[in-house]
Amino acid sequence: MPKEYTSVSKISGPLVLVENIENVKYGEVVEVKLANGEIRQGQVLEAQEGAALVQMFASTQDLSLKGMRVKFLGHVLEINLSPEILGRTFDGLGRPRDGGPEIIPQKRMDINGSPINPYSRAYPQEFIQTGISAIDGMNTIVRGQKIPIFSGAGLPHATLAAQIARQARLLNEEEKFAVVFGAMGITFEEANFFIENFKNTGALERTVLFINLANDPVIERIATPRFALTAAEYLAFDLDMHVLVILSDMTNYAEALREVSASRKEVPGRRGYPGYLYTDLATLYERAGRIRGKKGSITLLPILTMPEDDRTHPIPDLTGYITEGQIFLSRELHRRGIYPPIDVLQSLSRLMRGGIGEGRTRKDHGDLSNQLYAAYSRGLEAKELAVVLGEAALTEEDVQFLEFAEAFEMEFIKQGEYENRSIFETLDLGWKLLRRLPRSSLKRIRPEYLDEFWGKEDAS
């Protein structure tokens, strides 16, 4: 039976120091009983011989050293799991916040998990359809990939996250698909937006939500993505489901990590973030993937807002080293009313080539994507030239590419919040736009694909 200690010697911010203790381990769950009988929970942040530093899951402003009793429970944070978690909404510590009953566990799992052994990984190859052309056509996501969305303050990343969670599916409808959504440090209005959005569209029945609000304890914010990923591991590797995990906003997570680090008086790293920020992010991101011999998979889509739109900021910078590409949201496109404002030239999916082509999407997908990139890039160059020298300085072909770039933004990138395009609709739309250009300028597409999809009757 766990011992109770009354040897609390110091309370500093969210931290409580307990001395004269024994057999306490890092990450252990703690119960703190106040003089009035109220019980609060915490977690061991640091354990040394005879002492432990405890991070509380609630405010410590009204705590007093007098009458406090501390009990170390002998286990780390765990989550109750069963198939019943689908369709449920939990707080950042895995407690129901939807008014439903507690989960009767078929399994309890340590939320810290462990990254997948590189030797056991299977290479991600199968296509995931999001219904968004700028992603499916140009920056394809495959099962088991980890690819972040780099956004900025005021950009519609929350709307985009909800749309992806709502529309994402496999082309093979027979396979089981689920979404785990972990929200960190969001406002009540944002939380209500996600919950109502999923309820009203029927997406909630295949979704698990973990929501940490901005006024919830900081330590809970650090635990939230771990609860979400542990739930995803259960669905993927125990129930053989293909799981898309969306974590928003990782910037709030990193800020919480910095706050806890400052409370512990650790030596700060870049811009005040702890020196272990890279390692900590890797322990989250590397839990995504596929495992040989397992049917399920975890695909990770972390969303982060870049402070001051600075892509060299430590959070996006370190994230880029771990993940397999990125999707950039453009403030310029957003100003012009284009949703989703995805900057396809700045975005990249490093695993795209393995997930497209015949048998996965369509045989012309790779060539079409290359040609759209090249034509859009040339159109933007023509646009810059027209700004400096005037449109009169452009050749006839330059004008065609300029018009193509404008049409590409308004018809291909831009789409409705509830518009769900199939991959075949996206590819056909790409061909439709390319018909604005002379066939002779489409040098990135094989002749046989031009004959089949561009159309000989459209040749010029």
Swiss-Prot record:
Signal peptide: none annotated. Keywords: ATP synthesis, Hydrogen ion transport, Ion transport, Transport. SUPFAM superfamilies: P-loop containing nucleoside triphosphate hydrolases. The keyword Transport applies. It comes from the Bacteria. Disulfide bonds: none annotated. The keyword Transport applies. GO terms for biological process: proton motive force-driven plasma membrane ATP synthesis. GO terms for molecular function: ATP binding; proton-transporting ATP synthase activity, rotational mechanism. InterPro entries: ATP-synt_VA_C, ATPase_a/bsu_AS, ATPase_F1/V1/A1_a/bsu_N, ATPase_F1/V1/A1_a/bsu_nucl-bd, P-loop_NTPase, V-ATPase_su_B/beta. It holds the Pfam family ATP-synt_ab_N. NCBIfam families: PRK04196.1 (NF003235). Produces ATP from ADP in the presence of a proton gradient across the membrane. The V-type beta chain is a regulatory subunit. HAMAP family: ATP_synth_B_arch. Belongs to the ATPase alpha/beta chains family. This is V-type ATP synthase beta chain. It comes from Dictyoglomus thermophilum (strain ATCC 35947 / DSM 3960 / H-6-12). The lineage of its organism: Bacteria, Pseudomonadati, Dictyoglomota, Dictyoglomia, Dictyoglomales. The gene is atpB.
